[in-house]
Amino acid sequence: MSAPVFSTLGCRLNAYETEAMRELAAAAGVDNAVVVNTCAVTAEAVRKAKQEIRRLRRDNPQATIIVTGCAAQTEPATFAAMPEVDRVIGNTEKMQPATWAAMTPDLIGQTERVQVDDILSVRETAGHLIDGFGRHRAYVQVQNGCDHRCTFCI
């Protein structure tokens, strides 16, 4: 049994969310997995995500490769088509304990390979970010947006 390896690409929110996912994965007992938290802000960011996934597969041939983050949210079919990728998880799903519970060795074969919901259907505040509300600064999940449906959000 080995703890999951996490690779974070992109913004500070991704770094914060990677730490939250690390806790969720540990609590669920996920092992022998590599999680890539991607960025989609530019085409170059998506290209680097694919490059990182290929490198991680070479370095970890027996691990389950799980791709999440904004690039996985916006291009799930692209990442699902990569032979190196075992699972694609959307931005909403990556923060749900049930998603990580389904990634344990005894359940991994019984879960959907691609779990990406429409982010515009999200109607609740990201619970893992609420701790930051009492401070002067907080992280805002641009990829999930808000209920105002601005065109700024992905």
Language model regions located:
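Proteins enriched for Cys/Gly/acidic motifs involved in redox and nucleic-acid/cofactor modification
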Residues: 1-154
